[in-house]
Curated annotation (Swiss-Prot):
Mn(2+) 2 binds at residues 89, 121, 170, 245. The lineage of its organism: Eukaryota, Viridiplantae, Streptophyta, Embryophyta, Tracheophyta. It comes from the Eukaryota. SMART domains: PP2Ac. PROSITE patterns: SER_THR_PHOSPHATASE (PS00125). This is Serine/threonine-protein phosphatase PP1. It catalyses: O-phospho-L-seryl-[protein] + H2O = L-seryl-[protein] + phosphate; O-phospho-L-threonyl-[protein] + H2O = L-threonyl-[protein] + phosphate. CDD domains: MPP_PP1_PPKL. It is an enzyme of class 3 (hydrolase).
């Protein structure tokens, strides 16, 4: 993709900050297709299990909440001021999935060694056909553009290992995951199957309800108990599993005696939850701290207070 065009696309996407909330960026279908093609090429050049180094900032689900994505960058620094890893679920539910995914892909293309995107369960045609992204593509551009995104999403990597100690994915562990090399060997491009390792990495959830593996209420994949987390970390000499996939009230939530953390980065998710969003910063000693994007509070008369900045403190 022409570097001058890429810079101009990023400029137009960031200009939205100065417009009325919810205003769309002015991009053409041709420009978005070029972005998808360039990003797809980079995804396939890089491994399915990314090997990354701290310092890095990690974000969970964003779900088309574009103004909140911009708030995350306002706080953490716009690329390349900081390195980023996003854990998937960029589209669906929120009103501006197109702006959200386009900015993330543009940063991936511009800073391929500093900016990383993993696949979430919503980066899959059978899911985002239903939960909003297909309709947004069709309404604003075309079904053909949605298919272009599907081809791009089918190439996304699914896991990242930070300094050989923090394993990241969208969903969670899998009963089929015995060696990390298995992730490297997953074929791409691929759709997300209904069962198996790739499905579990994108869909599974931790659960305090039971030990071991159990049926997941989502109707897909499994849940895993604290025992499975401890067992996995010990076997692979890891310190922490970092995942997203579930709304958590404070934007982050520990599990299994701080051996696993869930990060969710869409505050006031869908306008229905009063949850905070969070971003986890990992410094070069692997100390983790959390920046909290507080939910907007309803004010008297039904207006909203959006002056909900961040707070930061040490964790884990």
């Amino acid at each position: 993709m022409d570097p001058a065009l890429l810079d101009d696309v990023i400029r137009r996407l960031l200009e939205v900050k100065n417009l009325k909330p919810g205003k769309n960026a002015q991009l053409s279908e041709s420009e978005i297709k070029q972005l998808c093609a360039a990003a797809k090429e980079i995804f396939l050049q890089q491994p399915n299990l990314l090997e990354l180094e701290a310092p890095i900032k990690i974000c969970g689900d964003v779900h088309g909440q574009y103004s909140d994505l911009l708030r995350l960058f306002d706080y953490g620094g716009y690329p390349p001021q900081a390195n980023y890893l996003f854990l998937g679920d960029y589209v669906d539910r929120g009103k501006q999935s197109l702006e959200t995914i386009c900015l993330l892909l543009a940063y991936k293309v511009k800073y391929p060694e500093n900016f990383f995107l993993l696949r979430g369960n919503h980066e899959c045609a059978s899911v985002n056909r239903i939960y909003g992204f297909y309709d947004e593509c069709k309404r604003r551009f075309s079904v053909k553009l949605w298919k272009t995104f599907t081809d791009c999403f089918n190439c996304l990597p699914v896991s990242a290992l930070i300094d050989e100690k923090i394993l990241c994915m969208h969903g969670g562990l899998s009963p089929e995951l015995n060696k990390l090399e298995q992730i490297l060997n997953l074929n791409r491009p691929t759709d997300v199957p209904d069962t198996g390792l790739l499905c579990d990495l994108l869909w599974s959830d931790p659960s305090n309800e039971a030990t071991g593996w159990a049926i997941n209420d989502r109707g897909v994949s499994f849940t895993f108990g604290p025992d499975k987390v401890s067992e996995f970390l010990e076997k692979h000499d890891l310190d922490l599993i970092c995942r997203a996939h579930q709304v958590v009230e404070d934007g982050y939530e520990f599990f299994a005696s701080r051996q696993l953390v869930t990060i969710f980065s869409a505050p006031n998710y869908c306008g229905e939850f009063d949850n905070a969003g969070a971003m986890m910063s990992v410094d070069d000693t692997l100390m983790c701290s959390f920046q909290i994007l507080k939910p907007a509070r309803k004010m008297m008369g039904g207006s909203t207070n959006n002056k909900s900045g961040f707070k930061s403190f040490r964790g884990w």
